[in-house]
């Protein structure tokens, strides 16, 4: 484990630095060498075929294959008050449905997890907008579904896979005599809004409505005609109101989901509808978990209690926030929305944990700029098996941005990509759009 002086390096490393390939330079005595990223990144192109097994990142094989798995789930009643223990070292905003991998070595945390396994396996993850914030107002319950204990250098370590379940509002926080923090929370309900046309159409005639059969593929002209015909029939009752059909479609869950799916297909050309949740609530959380937004925006999404409003906000963010800059510099562009792609079944971004217990939500992109590479490539504890990682820092302020991943075999595709940590990125609205300053643009929140 890293010493006190190496805490920052421990947060950025996936494992110890081990050379994957012999260094080109003869100066092999330097433990760490700085390399400025060359034109290789700028010339990177999107590969036509991805032969990487996208199920590997979601399985978190780096935690070990022999984890004890649990079945069933714990759900609390809406608006009920619960007292749930808090894991203090989990500094991320967990979204319901999002997977949270953990590696815990502190005796207090190990003891707490053991007790949770004997009960309902549920703990609280508090949502802080920044590390200086002392009290959180919202959070998400997390349920452990896989667990493993082992010893590393005589230290007991617990490896956990958990999943976000329900949003809550924090009512009270108190610390027990054993140091474990307990949170009294109120479970927040999901507001399910009726159909936009429900007020003007007779429910008795719903069974008489006939809709065209859904196309198998969305890539041909027939699909576009099908959707236009479907929209006309779905909103035909708008003719009886004072408002146009397009206005109702802005608050229709199915229409919003379809527009977001078109954006997601730009990140993953092989995306299939059956791999996405059909329920608007689950779908909205799935999208929220893979959006590269900062903590302030993410908490705003977590506060929203309606799937339709959440979908509207997500679509607005995807359309406007097209540039990702260094959070420390705020003006140094690292990548753009067009470079995002998916190398995992859960989308372009997911949470991973390094051997030191630091959780990073990592976004995969083809191309990144204004970055320096630190050290040599290493395959130790790689979140993407078959790829070696190298620490990447901002070229201007030297803050940690993520990692560059390079394939260890020539037949792998893509040969290289970047994994950028969400906490280091700042979503930005380019000034060229609509000639409006980003500070004056208001998102649909």
Curated annotation (Swiss-Prot):
Residue ranges constituting the Lon N-terminal domain according to the UniProt record = 84-322
Q: How is it modified after translation?
A: Ubiquitinated, ubiquitination is mediated by its own DCX protein ligase complex.
Q: Which SUPFAM superfamilies match?
A: PUA domain-like
Q: In which tissues is it expressed?
A: Highly expressed in brain.
Recorded topology in the membrane: Peripheral membrane protein
Changes seen on gene knockout: No obvious phenotype, however mice display increased BK channel activity and a subsequent decrease in synaptic transmission and presynaptic release probability in excitatory synapses. Mice also display cognitive behavioral defects such as abnormal passive avoidance, hyperanxious behavior and decreased preference for new objects. Treatment with the BK blocker paxilline rescues all synaptic and behavioral abnormalities except for hyperanxiety. Brain and synaptic morphology is normal and long-term synaptic plasticity is not affected.
Q: Name one GO biological process term.
A: negative regulation of protein-containing complex assembly
Question: Where does this polypeptide localize?
Answer: Cytoplasm; Nucleus; Membrane
Membrane-spanning ranges:
none
- Which Gene Ontology CC terms are recorded? Cul4A-RING E3 ubiquitin ligase complex; cytoplasm; membrane; nucleus; perinuclear region of cytoplasm
The entry's family comment says: Belongs to the CRBN family.
Complex and partners: Component of a DCX (DDB1-CUL4-X-box) protein ligase complex, at least composed of CRBN, CUL4A, DDB1 and RBX1. Interacts directly with DDB1. Interacts with KCNT1. Interacts with ILF2. Interacts with TRAF6 and ECSIT.
Which purpose does this protein serve, as stated in its record? Substrate recognition component of a DCX (DDB1-CUL4-X-box) E3 protein ligase complex that mediates the ubiquitination and subsequent proteasomal degradation of target proteins, such as MEIS2, ILF2 or GLUL. Normal degradation of key regulatory proteins is required for normal limb outgrowth and expression of the fibroblast growth factor FGF8. Maintains presynaptic glutamate release and consequently, cognitive functions such as memory and learning, by negatively regulating large-conductance calcium-activated potassium (BK) channels in excitatory neurons.
According to UniProt, the name of this protein is Protein cereblon
Q: Which organism is it from?
A: Mus musculus
């Amino acid at each position: 484990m890293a010493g006190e002086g190496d805490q920052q390096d421990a947060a950025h490393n996936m494992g110890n630095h081990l050379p994957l390939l012999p260094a080109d330079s003869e100066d092999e005595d330097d433990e760490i060498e700085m390399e400025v990223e060359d034109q290789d990144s700028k010339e990177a192109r999107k590969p036509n075929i991805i032969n990487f097994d996208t199920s590997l990142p979601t399985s978190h094989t780096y935690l070990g294959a022999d984890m004890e798995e649990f079945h069933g789930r714990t759900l609390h009643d809406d608006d009920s008050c619960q007292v749930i223990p808090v894991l203090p070292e989990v500094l991320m905003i967990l979204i319901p449905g999002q997977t949270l991998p953990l590696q815990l070595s502190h005796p207090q945390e190990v003891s707490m997890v053991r007790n949770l396994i004997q009960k309902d396996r549920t703990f609280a993850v508090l949502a802080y907008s920044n590390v200086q914030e002392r009290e959180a107002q919202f959070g998400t319950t997390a349920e452990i579904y896989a667990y493993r204990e082992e010893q590393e250098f005589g230290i007991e370590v617990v490896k956990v896979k958990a999943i976000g379940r329900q949003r809550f509002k924090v009512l009270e926080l108190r610390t027990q005599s054993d140091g474990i923090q307990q949170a009294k929370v109120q479970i927040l309900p999901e507001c399910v809004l009726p159909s936009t046309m429900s007020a003007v159409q007779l429910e008795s005639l719903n069974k008489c409505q006939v809709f065209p059969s859904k196309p198998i593929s969305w890539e041909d002209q027939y699909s576009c005609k099908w959707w236009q015909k479907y929209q006309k029939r779905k909103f035909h009752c708008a003719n009886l109101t004072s408002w146009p059909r397009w206005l109702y479609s802005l608050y229709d869950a199915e229409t919003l989901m379809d527009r977001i799916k078109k954006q997601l297909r730009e990140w993953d050309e092989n995306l299939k509808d059956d791999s996405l949740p059909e329920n608007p609530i689950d779908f909205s959380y799935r999208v929220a978990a893979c959006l590269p937004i900062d903590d302030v925006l993410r908490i705003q999404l977590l506060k929203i209690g309606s799937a339709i409003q959440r979908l509207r906000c997500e679509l607005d963010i995807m359309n406007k926030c097209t540039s990702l800059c260094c959070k420390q510099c705020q003006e140094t562009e690292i990548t753009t929305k067009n470079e995002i792609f998916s190398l995992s079944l859960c989308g372009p971004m997911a949470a991973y944990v390094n051997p030191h217990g630091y959780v990073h939500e990592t976004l995969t992109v083809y191309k990144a700029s204004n970055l320096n590479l630190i050290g040599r490539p290493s395959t130790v504890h790689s979140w993407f098996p078959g790829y070696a990682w190298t620490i990447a820092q901002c070229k201007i302020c030297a803050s940690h941005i993520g990692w560059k991943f390079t394939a260890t075999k020539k037949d792998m595709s893509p040969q290289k990509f970047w994994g950028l940590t969400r906490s280091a990125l700042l979503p930005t609205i380019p000034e060229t759009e609509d000639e409006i300053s980003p500070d004056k643009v208001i998102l649909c929140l």
